[in-house]
Regions:
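C-terminal motif of bacterial Sec signal peptides marking the signal peptidase cleavage site
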Residues: 27-31
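Acidic, polar ligand-binding/catalytic clefts
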Residues: 109-172
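Extracytoplasmic small-molecule ligand-binding "clamshell" domains
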Residues: 44-134, 292
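Periplasmic-binding protein-like
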Residues: 76, 153-160, 236, 240-278, ...
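Bilobed "Venus flytrap"/periplasmic-binding protein-like clamshell domains
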Residues: 79, 91-104, 136-137, 154-212, ...
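A ligand-binding cleft/hinge motif common to bilobed small-molecule-binding domains
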Residues: 118, 136-143, 191-192, 221-254
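Extended ligand-binding regions for polar small-molecule ligands
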Residues: 33, 46-50, 96-99, 104, ...
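Short helix-initiation/N-cap motifs at beta->coil->alpha
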Residues: 111-122, 166, 205-218, 254-256
Length: 319
């Protein structure tokens, strides 16, 4: 298990005027449209003014430099990392602002495109997207398919309806109905727990998988699901935005790095993106952006890496 990260407390997401409220969080995934911006009204703090760095820009592969724009696939249903602003079109979030800053360092523009989470890695692999930015946990399975550039650490958090009416115990959720977003690291987590239930002679967990996290959250709010699990900042953002309708269960666990997804043959681009992340970490832009989202004390890293050794990090108890 990874080293602990300080946890969110209620109210930490209120630094920006969260005008979208619960309605923005619970937008149906079918309403997700393309967006081309990372700024956006009322969320996060003031976007830092990031200037191009000539040395970093020189690392960008020539074909990308000639294009001048990185096409980035993201699932815009995963607040506060990536989600739609109140206009229903512009994609905002801390993931978006961080990568926009990286692109600015590399003297590149970004074209953000909404996509279903489970299609983004394939989209990068096929060349549809240059990069995938969508709170992707770096794991061995993904590293076998693509390059990944680390930029943030986060674990899994359980949450349920206020007062826990279904009496859900994350360590023994046998027979409960649990909501998760499809294709996330939470799916094998809950599947393993369900298998253990059956081995122990207990009823299996009913696992409800949804294309978007907003839909999974709504199923808990509506009472269709007893509880859910998601990446920690997403779970606490849902709790914040739904007022008194949700609450956390226990603490986060198994913290691991998020990574930007780059084609397996695009080593130069991956290295350039890593250098961009490292630059914003070193000059304080990284912390400034995360602070604007109430995340300055959660999951920050000091060193971005291309394809970090996950097994070694687990053994060392780090990240």
């Amino acid at each position: 298990m990874a080293s602990p990260i300080r946890f969110f407390q209620p109210g930490q997401f209120s630094r920006g005027a969260v005008a979208a409220g619960a309605a923005a969080l619970l937008l149906s995934a079918s309403a997700c449209g393309g967006g081309d911006g990372g700024g956006g009204g009322g969320q996060g703090g003031a976007t830092p003014d990031v200037q191009p760095d000539e040395e970093l820009a020189a690392l960008v592969p020539q074909e990308v430099r000639d294009a001048g724009t990185l096409t980035v696939g993201t699932d815009s249903s995963y607040a506060p990392a990536e989600f739609l602003d109140t206009d229903g079109k512009t994609i905002i979030g801390f993931d978006v602002e961080l990568f926009d800053a990286v692109a600015a360092k590399l003297d590149l523009d970004v074209a953000w495109e909404s996509a279903t989470f489970g299609t983004i890695v394939e989209g990068v692999d096929s060349g549809k997207y240059d990069v995938g930015i969508s709170s992707f946990t770096i794991n061995e399975e993904r590293l076998e398919q693509v390059n990944m550039v680390s930029y943030y650490n986060v674990g899994t958090q359980w949450f349920t309806a206020k007062g826990d009416p279904a009496g859900v115990d994350p360590e023994n959720a046998c027979g409960k109905t649990i909501a998760v977003q499809a294709n996330t690291v939470q799916v094998p987590d809950i599947e393993a727990r369900s298998e253990q239930c059956e081995e122990d002679g207990e009823p299996a967990i009913q696992i409800d998988q949804y294309e978007g996290q907003d839909e999974a959250t709504q199923s808990i709010v509506s009472g269709k699901s007893d509880a859910g699990l998601a990446d920690m900042p997403v779970a606490f953002y849902a709790i914040e935005q739904t007022g008194d309708k949700l609450e956390a269960l226990g603490e986060q666990y198994e913290a691991a790095p998020y990574g930007a997804v780059v084609h397996s043959d695009s080593d130069e681009l991956a290295e350039a993106i890593q250098a961009g992340y490292q630059s914003i970490i070193d000059d304080g832009t990284y912390e400034q952006i995360l602070d604007g989202w109430g995340l300055a004390d959660q999951g920050l890293i000091e060193e971005s890496e291309v394809n970090p050794d996950i097994a070694a990090e687990d053994e060392d108890g780090e990240a």
